Swiss-Prot record:
Family: Belongs to the ripply family.
Annotated spans, Disordered: 143-170
Natural source organism: Xenopus tropicalis (Western clawed frog)
Record key words, sorted: Developmental protein, Nucleus, Repressor, Transcription, Transcription regulation
Protein name per UniProt: Protein ripply3
Gene: dscr6
Length: 170
């Protein structure tokens, strides 16, 4: 046998040894489960992970990094992991990007869509406040809200009109 076959055989032996305990538990005695065989959950730290986390914190403090980010799971992510995506890209996500994002993301995550048109909402609120203030000033001064006679105004999508031409008989 050449060296590549030995490596393959060693790898297969290791895999079989690792999975043998799981196979025995599930096939021979499904009602008896070994407490050492648990599902891996990245948000739960194991003893080895805690030691590594402690060493990383000590190294970070030595470097002057004093951020307290709390317990982290696999690959340093705080769980539950949420990926935020703007609502305007929902259709793009559903068609292309979502599968790629979730396939390439190393841990389980959920995607949350947020409303990304906050600028237009703020502009609408500003316009509403301008109109409100204008009409409040007109009412306080006793001025008719249809502005003075002879003022020009425009209807959205229409030509400019003169108010005085519409104040006469109908």
């Amino acid at each position: 046998m050449d060296s590549s076959q030995y490596r393959l055989k060693a790898t297969l032996t290791q895999l079989c040894l690792c999975s043998r305990g799981v196979r025995n538990v599930t096939s021979e005695h499904p009602e008896q489960q070994d407490s050492s065989l648990t599902l891996w959950r990245p948000w739960l730290l194991r003893a080895g992970d805690r030691e590594l986390d402690g060493q990383q914190r000590r190294l970070g403090e030595a470097d002057g990094d004093h951020r307290n980010t709390g317990p982290k799971g696999a690959l340093g992510f705080q769980h539950p992991v949420r990926l935020y995506m703007p609502k305007s890209k929902t259709s793009e996500y559903l068609q292309h990007m979502g599968k790629k994002v979730l396939a390439n993301f190393p841990v389980q995550a959920t995607i949350h869509f947020y409303n990304d048109d906050s600028d237009s909402e703020e502009e609408e609120e500003d316009d509403e406040m301008e109109f409100y203030n204008y009409y409040q000033n007109c009412a306080a001064n006793g001025v008719n809200s249809s502005r003075g006679s002879g003022d020009n105004y425009s209807v959205p999508g229409g030509p400019k009109r003169n108010i005085s031409s519409h104040t006469g008989s109908a």
